């Protein structure tokens, strides 16, 4: 909580500008993440911690920008190696294979337990892509803070209504990824966890 919200707002503003104009996101990691998603026309969410207008909202600690990928467009694999919603800090990575916007295969740490929560196909929807922007947040197993850590990205399954998506289900599970490389329309915005914009 003890951060410069002015600096956070500026960091978020730069990312928001790129994501709002963007059409496609690609994310990779050394651990095997290689995922592509369409975000054309999607509004971005700016969690900058400044809630001074009527109707504004967010959560604390703040520090992320996020977008709901267009349903049915995400393909590839992502490897969660920090934490996963409802399961906390991961002892070993979790590998999630995605086809046409849905998680079709989950392997690794706690995979069987996670699968039990994903019986409904819509729960497997790729609901969110986000980038952490808080320099003082630390990975501790509480996904609400973990997803804000600068140098991470997160991908969520399930509900995306609050982000302007179309899938309404009673589930939203974030998977936090350390040190990703991220491109928006072939412009690199993060290199192995370091913001380069």
Where are these regions (language model features)?
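A beta-strand-loop signature enriched in Asp, Gly, Thr, and Trp
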Residues: 100-135
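Active-site bordering "gate/hinge" segments
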Residues: 1-87, 91, 95, 183-192, ...
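Active-site proximal loops enriched in glycine and acidic residues that flank catalytic Cys/His/Asp
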Residues: 80-82, 98-100, 107-110, 133, ...
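Short, solvent-exposed amphipathic alpha-helical segments in soluble enzyme
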Residues: 42-44, 94-97, 145-146, 171-172
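Short, catalytically relevant binding-site loops at active-site mouths
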Residues: 44, 84-87, 110-112, 135-137
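Cysteine/selenocysteine-centered motifs that mediate thiol-based redox chemistry or coordinate metal-sulfur cofactors
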Residues: 123-180
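Structural motif
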Residues: 24-26, 75-77, 95, 104, ...
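Composition- and surface-driven signal marking solvent-exposed, interaction-prone regions
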Residues: 90-93, 108-119, 143-144, 168-170
